[in-house]
């Protein structure tokens, strides 16, 4: 998840800049971001804001119930303050009773783990805005790019990934087995992190949700607590190796 935070924030900032060219008439851009039950990546879009009131103006996570009617009213309200509105949503936004928004529009398949394959929440809301408000609207899926792009790597993330690997080797040499490395945040400011081990059975196939107190009461935005948590993770730039004008990756033949 962590490697994707700067990618999501950077991409959403670029989308917001593109949306700003439509100042002459109201427009809505809906960005669908990965996250079935946990909205960490979608929450990262708040880092794209350059100032208070900047896009993305609305952010919706799956941790709180989503109401299409309330969404439309909120869009109408925000369009009175900005003519180009960017909205970020998690693919797993739901009504709080187990029904995903994307299920309101189409049949949904399952993956090899039996989890519902969620696609179409953004498209559903695009059509809803078009139907209810009759304005220019488009939806964008970040899709696999949000987890595989290396264009916005964080030095902090790479350093901690390497350090956790060294910690894991040391733990294995000490005889620990059936464990995963966990990251223990000791402080946000100054940023202090420690490593530990945890039983793999306590972690596999489980999810850590964004704390509800980090989400605004109406469920349409992210609070400062998340920003304090996430901002340290995207610090430091990394020079990506290039060849012939493109990123150059190690690969197996």
Locate predicted features.
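Accessory alpha-helical/coil subdomains and C-terminal extensions
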Residues: 1-138
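C-terminal non-catalytic interaction/assembly regions of soluble proteins
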Residues: 103-253
